Amino acid sequence: VDDSSVDAPIGLAMVSFIALYNVIELNVIIFFIFERKSGLYFWSFFFATWGIFFHTISYLMWNFGVLKNAVAWVTIAVIGWVLMVTSHSLVLYSRLHLILYDERILRLVLAIIITNLFIGYVSTIIVAYRAILALEPGPYVTAYPVYETIQVSLFIQEIIISGLYIWYTYKAFQMQEALRGAQASRMLYHLVAVNILVIILDVAVLVLEYNNPYNLQTAIKGMVYSIKLKIEYSILNSPINLVK
């Protein structure tokens, strides 16, 4: 598919509006359903949601000519991308505390997130701004897709965190199964299935990065992250109900 084809703008608009609709639903969850509006999980969820909004709206306005200032576009897009991806990883990290009590592993996961934040973003942001501000932007324009591809690959961390969650949830439910029987088994199957779906979505983001037109795949990323956050809310409630 070529970005210049007739179908590309239609596809971009469709996935963007799905992402923005999901942002509305996520804000309903944030402001009307969350009982505790504090802590790492809440604020990570909040910033990830608004990161999706800024990421999606920046590319939507740029591609349809509403936003014409390249610096403003890159700034909004960068803010959205950093908030969307890093905050989502922190959402995953914060819920690990419900079933994982090994501080060494938790510290390692947090260190990976922080390290990838600097490795994955700083160089890409510099290249992005140089590509639009440099007197001779050619080398930076050529380098940017390479940096962005490496950056996305670094976020295999989300797959790792989801894998840890599946493993330690399984171990926790094994201890509860003798006490709660079928209820614990059903909840375990649900959690494993949903987390596998999240991993599939993470893999889809990586595949999109390497195989789809830039404009369309950036829009799809926003939609995918909005779906993952909606799934995330359903994941959170199961272990909470089990340990009550």
Question: How should these model regions be labeled?
Answer:
Residues P9-A19, V71-V85, T124, Y144-I161, ...:
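Extracellular loop 3-seventh transmembrane helix
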Residues L96, L100, I105-W167:
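Membrane-proximal helix-loop-helix units in multi-pass membrane proteins
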